[in-house]
């Protein structure tokens, strides 16, 4: 019935992994923050969406961002793995994470600049691993 569309899809769709950004839902943020503790917004999403075997990728320049830490604790309680991306200092997130990539800077703007190539590299590595 949809032969042509099927051919277009088969020729053009790329492989994908299920991934959800916890900060990409403005309506949810607004509604949740009006009625609940704003620091728990990420944790609430992990609680609703996460399941054992999933991975939470938590980014915090200091490793002490409460909203990220609450999400990480929630993830661990659900049997999820936690990967952290932080600055150089040991932190609550680096201690809680199963794996933590710590870039060798402590100033926020420098940590953020060093995070860019790290997560681009991680994306490339995942693409290679899963889609060759």
Tell me what each language-model feature is.
Residues 7-58:
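Glycine-rich oxoanion-binding loops at beta->alpha junctions
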Residues 23, 60, 86, 101-109:
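Short beta->alpha connector loops at strand-helix junctions that form conserved
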Residues 62-66:
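Beta-rich strand-turn-strand
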Residues 1-2:
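Short, small-residue-biased leader/transition segments that mark boundaries at the very start
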Residues 85-97:
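Short, glycine/polar-rich helix-capping loops at beta-to-alpha or helix-loop-helix junctions
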Residues 48, 56, 109-132:
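A charged, well-structured terminal subsegment
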Residues 56, 82, 100-102:
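Short, well-ordered beta-strand core segments
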């Amino acid at each position: 019935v949809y032969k042509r569309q099927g051919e277009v899809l088969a020729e053009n769709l790329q492989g994908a992994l299920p991934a959800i950004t916890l900060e990409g839902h403005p309506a949810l943020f607004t509604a949740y923050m009006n009625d609940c503790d704003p620091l728990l917004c990420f944790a609430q999403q992990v609680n609703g969406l996460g399941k054992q075997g999933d991975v939470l990728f938590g980014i915090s320049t200091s490793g002490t961002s409460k909203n990220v830490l609450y999400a990480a604790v929630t993830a661990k309680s659900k049997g999820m793995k936690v990967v952290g991306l932080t600055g150089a200092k040991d932190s609550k997130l680096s201690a809680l994470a199963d794996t933590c990539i710590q870039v060798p800077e402590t100033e926020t703007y420098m940590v953020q600049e060093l995070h860019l190539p790290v997560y681009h590299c991680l994306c490339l590595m995942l693409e290679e691993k899963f889609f060759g």
